[in-house]
A protein has these predicted regions:
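Conserved catalytic cysteine-centered active-site region
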Residues: 1-35, 47-48
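Hydrophobic pocket-lining "lid/loop/helix" segments that shape and contact the acyl-thioester
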Residues: 42-161
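Short glycine-aspartate micro-motif
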Residues: 37-39
């Protein structure tokens, strides 16, 4: 590989590594002018495939598969003219500081000693709360001031009545 090419590997994080990689590429493009960044993301289930009988671990085999995606990010003048999309901002939220969220999905051995990924029933609630906090942060950064004021007034009235 040429000396002017940098390569980074984020592994063991599943599809969540894609958001990290795009955020990292965006930050690198802020530093390096007239550059390109390619983000290649793959998710390979074979590493986490579970062959045991524990139902809480079998669900992962049904939900996730092998897949991939790629995106080219650029900050060149030509890219501004010809690109179809523009990355305005990236946003990541996490809830691992809450015990319920932290323990909703984890890797452990079953009673037979087979390694599997356990998904708890709390996962859907945690995912909903994470999505809500993500939309809250995104809305506050994108909505115009008039909409923010209207939202504040509506919350105020709901608390009073």
């Amino acid at each position: 590989m040429r000396s002017d090419i940098k390569s980074y590997t984020l592994s063991g994080m599943g599809c969540s590594a894609s958001a990290l990689a795009i955020d990292m590429a965006q930050n690198l493009l802020k530093i390096h002018r007239n550059s390109h960044a390619i983000v290649l993301s793959t998710e390979i289930l074979s590493n986490g495939f579970y062959s045991g009988n524990d139902r809480s671990k079998l669900l992962l085999n049904c939900l996730f598969r092998t897949g991939s995606a790629a995106i080219l990010l650029s900050n060149t003048k030509e890219a501004k003219e010809y690109s179809k999309y523009k990355l305005l901002r990236t946003l990541r939220t996490q809830r691992a500081f809450e015990d319920k969220a932290y323990h909703s999905a984890f890797r452990e051995e079953d009673s037979e000693g087979k390694l599997g990924f356990t998904l708890k029933r709390d996962l859907l609630q945690v995912a909903g709360e994470t999505l809500k906090s993500n939309i809250t942060v995104l809305g506050s950064s994108m909505l115009p001031l008039s909409e923010k004021v209207w939202h504040g007034v509506s919350i105020f009235w709901k608390k009073i009545y």
